[in-house]
Amino acid sequence: MTMCSGARLALLVYGIIMHNSVSCSPAAGLSFPGIRPEEEAYDQDGNPLQDFYDWDPPGAGSPASALRDAYALYYPADRRDVAHEILNEAYRKVLDQLSARKYLQSMVARGMGENLAAAAVDDRAPLTKRHSDGIFTDSYSRYRKQMAVKKYLAAVLGKRYKQRVKNKGRRIAYL
């Protein structure tokens, strides 16, 4: 509704400007490049007079320029700068909140929601690096557990485990 009324206001202002420029201009606000006077007109000193067919009246412009002029008339530059600054601050706050919310959701999804203080210290590392580090840590801890189980089995089974390794030529996993 507000955009519609704003567009109507801009159209009204543009219509008023165009109406005034058409009724007040010597060439009726229109340029006819194909129509030229037969002879040129000169003033008292012999200088040629201005050609009204090549002259653009100051009020006739594109609708965008009329809208800019109306905007500049009602909203001075100093007020616009303050408004833009306030808008930029609010936009930045909203983006910060969205990024923080997205970060917290990713932390909860990964199951690290209980360790937020430690994660906040390491904010500089990208999430992909953290993810790959987590995969490596999980794989390495799994490997260490497997080696511990093999070592335990070797100690319990003793000689029998070593014989099987020699006979087969490779290690036998008891997992």
From Swiss-Prot:
One of its GO terms (biological process) is histamine secretion. The modification Leucine amide is found at L157. Its main location: secreted. It is found in: Secreted. It comes from the Eukaryota. The modification Lysine amide is found at K168. Residues 1-24 form the signal peptide. InterPro entries: Glucagon_GIP_secretin_VIP, VIP/GHRH-like. Residues 149-157 are annotated as: Important for receptor binding. Keywords: Amidation, Cleavage on pair of basic residues, Hormone, Neurogenesis, Secreted, Signal. GO terms for cellular component: cytosol; extracellular space; neuron projection; neuronal dense core vesicle lumen; perikaryon; terminal bouton. One of its GO terms (molecular function) is pituitary adenylate cyclase activating polypeptide activity. Residues 25-78, 172-175 form a propeptide. PACAP is a neuropeptide involved in diverse array of physiological processes through activating the PACAP subfamily of class B1 G protein-coupled receptors: VIP receptor 1 (VIPR1), VIP receptor 2 (VIPR2), and PACAP type I receptor (ADCYAP1R1). Exerts neuroprotective and general cytoprotective effects due to anti-apoptotic, anti-inflammatory, and antioxidant actions. Promotes neuron projection development through the RAPGEF2/Rap1/B-Raf/ERK pathway. In chromaffin cells, induces long-lasting increase of intracellular calcium concentrations and neuroendocrine secretion. Belongs to the glucagon family. This is Pituitary adenylate cyclase-activating polypeptide.
